[in-house]
From Swiss-Prot:
Belongs to the ESV1 family. It comes from the Eukaryota. This is Protein LIKE EARLY STARVATION, chloroplastic. Expressed ubiquitously. GO terms for cellular component: chloroplast; chloroplast stroma; cytosol; starch grain. Transmembrane segments: none annotated. GO terms for biological process: regulation of starch metabolic process; starch metabolic process. Disruption phenotype: No visible effect on starch and sugars turnover. In the double mutant esv1-2 lesv-1, starch is more rapidely degraded during the night. Binds preferentially to highly ordered alpha-glucans, such as starch and crystalline maltodextrins. Involved in the organization of the starch granule matrix, thus influencing starch turnover by modulating the accessibility of starch polymers to modifying and degrading enzymes involved in phosphorylation, hydrolyzes and synthesis, including starch synthases (SSI and SSIII), starch phosphorylases (PHS1), isoamylase, beta-amylase, glucan water dikinase (GWD) and phosphoglucan water dikinase (PWD). Keywords: Chloroplast, Plastid, Transit peptide.
Length: 578
């Protein structure tokens, strides 16, 4: 046993030599101790032969393990001694510099006292606002992550795509039924979406840094070096959007009043799934707005005078202009222009930004962002962008917009929409509007403190489509929330087979609930299966002769979008600009 243990220790040390009776590997040692043990090879297990293993271990010479251990101990002692010396040196230096640090801090504090009280208060207010905004953003991010399944925009996953086998089953009975949430986070800082400096971290120059002498006096019509926009200055018709887009070109743009809040309306049941004139008018207005924004961006980028970098109007409004060119990580070159301004009394600060971007592989982009804030706590932001690109030889076009505003009292609203088209005929669109006010605000019957509206549609280009609408609201009633809503959706394949379904619901503050759901199964036979039920005991299930109607293709598709995007198609490639 001892002999076997000696062999194992020698093998672990790595200075071993094996002799199996056939081959012997030689190694020179100044002195060695031999351990011999009988070993049975694999062949001996079969009765063929046996062998002997010999282990030779050296403990002398220049590379013995005893010397290596001694060197390691010495090295460790030296390292500890060096660390003690270094600590002593730092301690001595710290004592010497303590007096210098105190004098330096005193000088810095004296410089702070030299700044006026008003300036210090202004900086502190900005810091408080920034920290509060960061805290709110973090809280919203947490809420969004917890409710990611409920607050997702557009179509949630590919399971909702139209297939050739859409039938009336319990599984698709819930298809398109969108979960309701209360808070939807807005798009935060513009740094991730727009080029150039960020508005929310900007502070206008103060005091002697800017004066009427330093600024170039300009006449009021040239206050902002842009041309009038005949589209945006048109009188709004009755069919226009209820939330007007801000425009720095309109006569009201620099009156610095917050756009009106979306009306708090009672949710009504959609009895018909055909597109209403309101929906068609809304989409038409969105297209006009997109075209007007594209014209404005192109006009600003082409007409601004590079020599004019700042100015002041007759009424004391001051503005600054900055331009730049950025290259994105994917090779896209972006050219942007930014105009910032502040009223004469310093109450309102705003920023308008425009940009165009392109590469040499077919990508083009136009965009604008308009932001503002005032001394009463009102803030607002309007973002718009359209782009076109090619993927596997197919042209894609995309349009998106995001309007958001919040008052100093905490009232908040947002409106977002997104559209995507490609040359194969596929298209997808969605929009989402919401608002919230202080829950202690008194309201008329049927109105709410929190209100949402979503709609979306998706076309596969072959005759299949999916559409949905979802409205819901919440009202604070003293010690709880009353909630109600209405939604419907439809899902059809190219063979006109599919399902239409909807639900109207209500939920009281004490958890009492009521709902009525309905559905229609279409199989292309000329008969429609209609069914439904309610929590109050209603129930129906019947088949009626009825033709199937649904939208196979969008009334505004890829070629309409392509023809209307004149300014976007005119954006030059980087190689054409040089």
């Amino acid at each position: 046993m001892a002999l076997r243990l000696g062999v194992s220790i020698g093998a672990a040390l790595g200075s071993s030599h094996w002799d199996d009776g056939q081959r012997v590997r030689q190694r020179d040692f100044s002195a060695s101790v031999n351990f011999t043990a009988p070993v049975t090879s694999r062949r001996s297990l079969r009765g063929s032969r046996t062998g002997v293993r010999i282990l030779r271990v050296s403990n002398e010479g220049r590379e013995s393990y005893l010397d290596m251990w001694k060197n390691a101990v010495d090295r460790e002692k030296k390292e500890k001694a060096f660390e003690k010396i270094a600590e002593n040196v730092v301690a001595v230096d710290g004592e010497k510099e303590k007096g210098g640090d105190l004098e330096k801090k005193s000088d810095e504090f004296q410089k702070i006292l030299e700044v006026s009280v008003e300036e210090r208060d202004r900086i502190q207010r900005m810091q408080v606002v920034d920290r509060a905004a960061a805290a709110i953003s973090a809280a919203r991010a947490i809420l969004a992550s917890n409710n990611s399944g409920d607050g997702k925009e557009g179509f949630p996953n590919e399971d909702n795509t139209v297939t050739s086998e859409v039938t009336e089953t319990p599984k698709n009975a819930k298809l398109g039924m969108w979960s309701r949430t209360v808070y939807v986070p807005r798009s935060e800082t513009s740094g991730t979406e727009t080029p150039g400096p960020d508005f929310w971290s900007w502070t206008p120059p103060q005091g002697s840094e800017i004066s009427s002498v330093d600024l170039q006096a300009v006449e009021k019509p040239a206050e902002f070096p842009t041309l009038p926009n005949p589209v945006l200055e048109k009188d709004k018709s009755a069919d226009s959007l209820s939330i007007p887009y801000e425009s720095m070109l309109s006569s009201e743009r620099h009156s610095f009043t917050i756009p009106p809040f979306e009306s708090l309306i009672e949710v009504r049941k959609e009895a018909e799934t055909k597109p209403s004139s309101e929906t068609l008018s809304t989409e038409h207005d969105l297209d006009l707005i997109s075209s007007a924004n594209a014209e404005e961006v192109a006009r600003v980028l082409d007409s601004l005078d590079e020599s004019s970098t700042h100015g002041v109007s007759e009424d004391g409004l001051k503005w600054w202009k900055q331009t730049g060119v950025e290259k994105r990580p994917d090779g896209v070159v972006c050219r942007w222009t930014m105009i910032r301004g502040v009223t004469a009394d310093g109450v309102v600060e705003w920023q308008d930004k425009y940009w165009e971007a392109s590469d040499d592989f077919g990508f083009k982009e136009l965009g604008s962002e308009k932001s503002g804030r005032d001394a009463t706590g009102n803030v607002w932001r309007e973002f718009w962008r359209e782009s076109m690109s090619q993927e596997n030889g197919v042209v894609h076009m995309e349009k998106t917009a995001d309007k958001w505003g919040k008052s100093g009292q905490g009232d908040e609203w947002q409106e977002k929409w997104w559209e995507h088209y490609d040359a194969t005929g596929k298209s997808e669109k969605w929009a989402h509007k919401w608002c919230s006010i202080d829950r202690n605000t008194p309201l008329d019957a049927g109105h709410a403190h929190v209100w949402h509206e979503r709609w979306g549609e998706k076309y596969d280009g072959q005759g299949g489509s999916t559409k949905y609408t979802d409205k819901w609201a919440e009202r604070w009633v003293g010690d709880g929330w009353d909630k109600w809503g209405d939604k419907w959706d439809e899902n059809f394949n190219p063979s006109a087979q599919g399902v239409k379904q909807g639900e109207t619901w209500w939920e009281g503050k004490h958890g009492d609930r009521w709902n009525r759901s309905w559905g229609e199964g279409h199989n292309g036979s000329g008969w429609v299966h209609k069914y439904g039920k309610s929590s109050s005991g209603e129930h129906w299930d019947t088949h009626v002769p009825q033709e199937t109607w649904y939208e196979k293709f969008p009334h505004f598709g890829f070629f309409h979008c392509f023809d209307n995007s004149v300014q976007l198609r005119a954006v030059k490639k980087p190689s054409d600009m040089s």
